[in-house]
């Protein structure tokens, strides 16, 4: 009961996306209160702005709440933001697409969607390392050796990253 009081106090002081998201995680994991966690994840969603935030929340929603439909909705927002050129902070657009493709494959198991996203990563790749990492993702997640080799060949044609 005292833990619940602490969480109520923490919720009253929460302001930022990570406050609400972390609190929801903790309430779900420690109090096993799915309803309260869901409420906090909904608040978190209203605070999401960039692709990475929507994608990270989708992973949590799927993992902790097992809500595939909500996760798909958030992943679609992620894709829309990336297609609009909004890459994740500190990442290139090609890497943002690759990370997103990895999530689609790992979380949803949707290989067709992941392939579509990886193609966008390849289209946006301008650096050798982007293509090398993408080749690894294509091999690991799609098990497409032929495509991975083609991406590797493309990477070899580029100069080393400066």
Positions of predicted regions on the chain:
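Structural register within alpha-helical repeat arrays
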Residues: 10, 23-27, 57-61, 93, ...
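Alpha-helical repeat scaffolds
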Residues: 2-11, 34-45, 69-81, 110-122, ...
């Amino acid at each position: 009961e005292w833990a619940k009081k602490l969480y109520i106090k923490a919720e009253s002081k929460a302001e930022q996306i990570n406050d609400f998201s972390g609190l929801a995680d903790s309430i779900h994991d420690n109090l096993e209160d799915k309803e309260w966690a869901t409420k906090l994840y909904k608040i978190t969603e209203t605070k999401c702005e960039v692709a990475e935030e929507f994608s990270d929340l989708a992973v949590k929603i799927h993992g902790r709440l097992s809500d595939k439909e909500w996760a798909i909705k958030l992943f679609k927002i992620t894709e829309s933001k990336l297609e609009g050129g909004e890459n994740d902070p500190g990442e290139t657009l090609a890497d943002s697409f690759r990370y997103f493709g990895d999530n689609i494959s790992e979380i949803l198991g949707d290989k067709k969607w992941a392939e579509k996203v990886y193609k966008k990563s390849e289209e946006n790749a301008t650096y050798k390392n982007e293509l090398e990492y993408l080749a690894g993702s294509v091999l690991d997640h799609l098990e497409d050796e032929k495509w991975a080799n083609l991406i590797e060949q493309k990477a070899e044609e580029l100069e080393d990253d400066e």
